[in-house]
Amino acid sequence: MRPERTWFPLTGAVTPGAAAGPKPTGPIDPLAGPKQVLAGRVVTMDDALSVRPDGVVYIDRGCVVAVQDRGQPAPAGFEQVKVVLTGGTIYPGLIELHNHLSYNVLPLWSPVPKRFEHRGQWADHKEYRPKISGPMTVIGEHRDAAGEADLVPALVRYVECKCLLGGVTTSQGIMLASNAGIRRYYRGLIRNVEQTDDPALSEAQSRIADVDAEDAQRFLTQLRKEDSCYLLHLSEGVTDPKQPEKSQAREHFCSLEIAPGQWALTNAFCGIHAAGLLPEDFAVLAGRHASMVWSPLSNLLLYGGTARVEAARKEGVRIGLGSDWSPTGSKNLLGELKVAWLYSQHVLNGLFSARDLVAMVTREAASILKWDGLVGRIAAGARADLLVIHGTAGDPYEALIRAREVDIRLVMINGAARYGTSALMGPLAPKDQTVRVGGESRALYLKQQQADPDVAAVSLRTAKTTLREALLDIAKLAKEAEKPKPAPARRALDAPVRPVWSLALDEIPDQGED
């Protein structure tokens, strides 16, 4: 369990009094929404994996009250609520357990210059700084004439909307760091697995750096304290089974063995990538009820191979799915589903069914987070995180995998309709913004009671324009950043500190304490 946090907005001064003040509590949107009724084919992803061909989902105060067939009487209190006919198939919102969201303004690193053996190599390649870390550092630390981090709000708005347009309702967070030594996750539209601000949804930890052998015991102690999961980048690279001792990627997994047969692994452990593990390593994970997140496209582009998910499946290791980041991964989780499907069909002889893969981004991901029953399924008592795609014909699981962004009719989080066609958004949300997807108009509702004011002031259209111009002028912005800045004026010791926020990127050293 984490200590109590203080909420700091992107704007305004931080004073000692404010630092001690209350933070927002409760979910990303208050559980106070109106009664709503959605009709369509309902893919519940419940324990029975039931599908209702002509179903109705009843929602009140952000939660699902009931899921029934159209012919059944409405639950008490819903008799006069108008039924919204979706004309589509209703799924739980997609849950992504691996994504570096801040980087999702960048294009694909194409072609990847060579096949790498482990993650320690590609970050040192000569192309990495000019194409990835350099632009992101400039965007994350850029200051306008007033000294404000003017590109950060645009980036946050853009990458969150990119999630919504792909049906994602839960992902990893965007870490911010301030000049006052404060670190926090951005509180936004989609659920953040590391900072839910919801007592019913326990918060995950995440770590990119490897755990060294001398730290394994301390890591195990930390794992035993977790009430959600610990998302650790694990064994990111490839291993030749004929020469496993030469694999640096697998070496980091072996570092988790504290003593013969004693591992720094529990049911809270979730290994992201796990690409360098051998079949026998998945038996170790399974024996300790650990789980993994599969990111096939990024693995294939960087390493020419991916996790031995067939071994994970054989051993009963629970698997989630993540698109990683846009430089080497899919543009969203909907795209990563397609990569996983193609890999399963053409490399693994159809090992994973379409239903298996849909489970990885719904109920299985929720189980990894210890959020069973609350998200990842459509059932009474679950949060109304929903995704609707066009049409009700054919296999419902293949329909989701084959769906394109233009097929998405509605995305709802905590009962708040956030994105969809005008026909569905009209009766469910106030007018806000529009965006064109595949040549068709879609509606967005991005307003929140507790939004960061800087981000709230940025429309998606403005965010796109701002980021496009910044990336086109990235060399110029980089040179400006290198110019010496005037020393800040002195202030009284008790004067408020004006925080200036930057993106806390993977390559940038820590700038404060959690």
Q: Which stretches of residues belong to each language-model region?
A:
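Active-site metal-binding motif and surrounding structural segment of the metallo-beta-lactamase
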Residues: G71-Y91, E96
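The right-handed parallel beta-helix/beta-solenoid scaffold, focusing on the short coil/turn
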Residues: G55, Q80-V81, V317
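Short beta-alpha connecting loops at secondary-structure transitions
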Residues: G320-W325, L342-A354, P396-L400
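Active-site microenvironment of metallo-dependent hydrolases
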Residues: M1-G77, N99-L201, L220-L223, L234, ...
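Short, charged, surface-exposed secondary-structure boundary motifs
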Residues: L301-R308, S330-N332, Y397-A399, T421
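Structural motif of enzymes handling amino- and sulfur-group chemistry
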Residues: L333-W341, V361-T362
